[in-house]
Amino acid sequence: MSKDIPTPYMWSFQPQMGLAAGAAQDYSSKMNWLSAGPHMISRVNGVRARRNQILLEQAALTATPRNQLNPPSWPAALIYQENPPPTTVLLPRDAQAEVHMTNAGAQLAGGARHSFRYKGRTEPYPSPAIKRVLIRGKGIQLNDEVTSPLGVRPDGVFQLGGSGRSSFTARQAYLTLQSSSSAPRSGGIGTLQFVEEFTPSVYFNPFSGSPGHYPDAFIPNFDAVSESVDGYD
């Protein structure tokens, strides 16, 4: 085979730290050319050269420009910040309170509270207490988007006074909650960013220069935690 067409170095991922754990050549991907003639060998070399060209183009498109190939801690500006999707929850309904509002009469919005005064009584009757259901959240904020034209009110016709009950079609009302992070994350990268940042590396003429210029990450016993090679100074 031609020495001018190297086998790419395949990177491995260290998920606990979110870093690349070194790279090694994948010789299992080589084609069987031992019994091939010159014409077949030429075609195989053409396929390998085209593969390396695709990898070089992919690395130029997806890799983030940075001073250090595999930094021990990625800054927040270079890390993909995950935005969790909004959470939609069903608003609690109190059917008994809604019926009580309809039968007894209540002011749904605006102005002061309703009070009922009867003949022969100096003080007005206080408005009956209506059970309120509180929604408590932890580290969430309301989303600006309105997911339902119904809003948060039940859709129907209410009778504000009198003894008759209203007939309304109870519909489910939803509330959209969106989580927010307090600060952008820094440190290790995720699997998706690793695949884009560390495409298989094409290293031409790896043994033609000084041994000190050979990347440590391409040595099989490279330790990504200590950023050193076992047995080497």
Curated annotation (Swiss-Prot):
GO terms for molecular function: hexon binding. Induction: Expressed in the late phase of the viral replicative cycle. Coiled coil: none annotated. It comes from the Viruses. The modification Phosphothreonine is found at T64. The record marks G111, A112, S163, G164 as: Cleavage. Belongs to the adenoviridae hexon-linking protein family. Interacts with the peripentonal hexons as well as the hexons in the facets. Part of a complex composed of the core-capsid bridging protein, the endosome lysis protein VI and the hexon-linking protein VIII; these interactions bridge the virus core to the capsid. This is Pre-hexon-linking protein VIII. It comes from Human adenovirus A serotype 12 (HAdV-12).
